């Protein structure tokens, strides 16, 4: 059953974004979700030429989570447009498609950050598994970065604690601007990104962020073993890397462009292994080495 919602959302969001003068051509992929209507309305209001796909409720050519779907219809429809935006069903996750190529969700956060820096924001909170490229970009442009545990609530908590105006979670393509609201907001973010896609900073930042490769994966183990596995793994990783961070799971900084993070899932019987480097070969090797160490740790404690 559908209900019409009366809301000042589009007007309020458009005030933050401002009017876009160069009329970007955008494609909006609603994914058949409840967020339908709002993204297209907002993007049109700020000055975009908008084409919308998958806008019928509960009817979609793709799955509900744009971070894991191939987004084939959006990719096809974006080839002659400036950018494509794919939302999850409630509009907090956002993935972008440029030149017919789906980008990592960290790039969504990164592009929100580019706009936030342009707006004069200085303090940023990033979850522990967010790309190092976003952190480096912020620091290179005079901003300060704080890291939080993974999860939207942890990011917003750290934002309040550190008086940071902007936050985000790379893994979910989630960008948070506290002057608007304290949650991931893909709809607002799409407008913020649309306002800079024809600027040099957009191309420069995209080029910089795409030099990095991130692998996020999980290995299945019963949750009753998770703590013991991580305890055994902690000493192995410390021995291998010299030092580790334990803000959320176990994170090792391999070098200034590479890291690996192992943490237990809060929602399923799995241990998550994320790794990043500016070398694809290196990130694959690091990721596999640590997955092997997780397995060794399990063999040791079972």
Functional labels for PLM-detected ranges:
Residues 1-79:
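Gly/Ser/Thr-enriched, mixed-charge loops and adjacent short helices
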Residues 81, 120-302:
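Phosphate-binding and adjacent anionic-ligand microenvironments
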Residues 28, 85, 190:
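Two-metal-ion RNase H-like nuclease active-site motif
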């Amino acid at each position: 059953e559908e209900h019409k919602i009366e809301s000042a959302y589009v007007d309020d969001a458009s005030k933050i974004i401002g009017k876009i003068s160069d009329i970007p051509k955008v494609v909006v992929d609603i994914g058949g979700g409840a967020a339908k209507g709002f993204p297209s309305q907002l993007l049109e209001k700020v000055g975009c030429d908008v084409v919308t796909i998958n806008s019928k409720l509960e009817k979609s050519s793709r799955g509900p989570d744009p971070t894991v779907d191939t987004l084939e219809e959006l990719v096809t429809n974006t080839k002659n447009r400036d950018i494509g935006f794919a939302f999850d069903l409630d509009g907090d996750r956002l993935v972008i498609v440029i030149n017919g190529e789906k980008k990592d969700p960290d790039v969504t956060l990164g592009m929100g950050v580019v706009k936030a820096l342009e707006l004069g924001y200085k303090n940023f909170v990033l979850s522990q598994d967010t790309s190092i490229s976003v952190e480096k970009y912020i620091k290179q442009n005079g901003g300060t970065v704080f890291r939080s545990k993974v999860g939207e609530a942890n990011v917003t908590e750290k934002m309040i604690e550190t008086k940071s105006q902007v936050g985000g979670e790379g893994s979910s393509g989630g960008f948070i601007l506290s002057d608007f609201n304290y949650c991931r907001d893909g709809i607002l973010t799409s407008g913020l990104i649309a306002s800079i896609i024809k600027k040099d900073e957009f191309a420069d930042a995209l080029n910089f962020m795409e030099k990095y490769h991130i692998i996020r994966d999980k290995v299945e183990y019963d949750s009753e073993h998770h703590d013991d596995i991580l305890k055994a793994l902690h000493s192995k990783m410390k021995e291998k890397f010299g030092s580790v961070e334990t803000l959320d799971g176990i994170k090792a900084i391999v070098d200034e462009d590479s890291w690996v993070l192992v943490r237990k899932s809060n929602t399923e019987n799995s241990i998550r292994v994320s790794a990043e480097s500016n070398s694809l070969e290196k990130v694959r090797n690091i990721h596999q080495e640590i997955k092997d160490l997780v397995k060794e740790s399990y063999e040791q404690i079972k």
